[in-house]
Design a protein with these regions (language model features):
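Helix-start (N-cap) detector for alpha-helical repeat units in TPR-like alpha-solenoids
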Residues: 56-57, 90-91, 124-125, 158-161, ...
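Register position in tetratricopeptide repeats
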Residues: 68-69, 102-103, 136-137, 173, ...
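Canonical positions in the second alpha-helix
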Residues: 47-48, 81-82, 115-116, 149-150, ...
């Protein structure tokens, strides 16, 4: 009996290892993008949840830990488990919707984030990710509405910079250029922060040129994907789809496949066909 029990435990460990390297997304061209191995955070979060399996905070903690190593499909299963426990918890829909976005299941992402909005219309994470999904669907006015609602509810300056960036992009793509400029002129992101969105906002304001957005210091895959998409979108707004395509393709080459810039670059390249 002890031998069987040990073998079962070992098999469970192997399943977790295999899951840690599982295929998360296969692109239309057949490129497979995989998750990474757990470095301990997932195991600790799983153990904490096992000790209190109906604790929704621990469910979310496990899903967030899985997301940290790009185990997005596993995280979706975790959040689904949480929704079975607490079907009216807005944060579970916020997180599962985000992860559906990560694996390019946009309809499911929209359904979850819309449900999250119905439960808590003031939640920044719900609003922000709902805006991303609307943008991906080409619903730019609706995206602008979501980011406008999110902007004053940003929990910290980095998030404020992000929602300001996406609001400018959404307004611009909706053809509402005067509103986009007026919003930037109010400088809602006046507190300085060093992130990709801050670099992109400098481009939108004319403080730097498109060739200056991506620097030698930008080596992380998601960072490069984010910056390249921003420049590509800026060219779309200016009507230069040839240069836009170049930057969208660069975003894909970055390898930062979980990033919104990568996801939206895929979308934009399909639109440009």
């Amino acid at each position: 009996m002890r031998t069987i029990r040990v073998a079962t435990i070992a098999l469970g460990a192997l399943v977790h290892v295999a899951g840690a390297q599982s295929i998360q997304y296969r692109s239309p061209s057949g490129v497979e993008y995989r998750s990474m191995a757990d470095t301990g955070a997932v195991a600790r979060a799983r153990a904490a949840l096992d000790a209190d399996p109906r604790n929704v905070d621990r469910v979310i903690a496990l899903g967030v830990a899985q997301s940290g190593v790009r185990q997005f499909r596993e995280a979706i299963e975790t959040f689904t488990r949480g929704i079975a426990i607490a079907p009216d918890n807005a944060m579970l829909y916020r997180w599962r919707g985000h992860r559906y976005l990560s694996v390019r299941e946009l309809d499911r992402a929209l359904a979850d984030l819309s449900r999250g909005f119905a439960l808590d219309s003031l939640n920044y994470g719900v609003l922000y990710h709902l805006g991303i999904v609307r943008f991906a669907r080409g619903e730019f006015d609706a995206a602008a509405d979501a980011f406008r609602r999110a902007q004053p509810r940003a929990p910290e300056v980095g998030e404020l910079t992000g929602s300001t960036d996406w609001l400018w992009m959404s307004l611009s793509r909706a053809g509402r250029h005067a509103e986009a400029k007026a919003m930037l002129d109010r400088r809602p992101d006046s507190v300085k922060v060093a992130n990709a969105y801050a670099q992109r906002l400098r481009l939108y304001r004319g403080e730097i040129g498109p060739d200056e957005v991506i620097t030698a210091a930008d080596t992380a895959d998601v960072q490069k994907a984010t910056l390249a998409f921003g420049v590509g979108n800026w060219y779309v707004v200016r009507g230069d789809t040839a240069r836009a395509r170049t930057y969208f393709e660069a975003s894909i080459r970055s390898g930062g496949w979980p990033g919104f810039g990568f996801i939206l670059s895929e979308v934009e390249l399909r639109r440009l066909r």
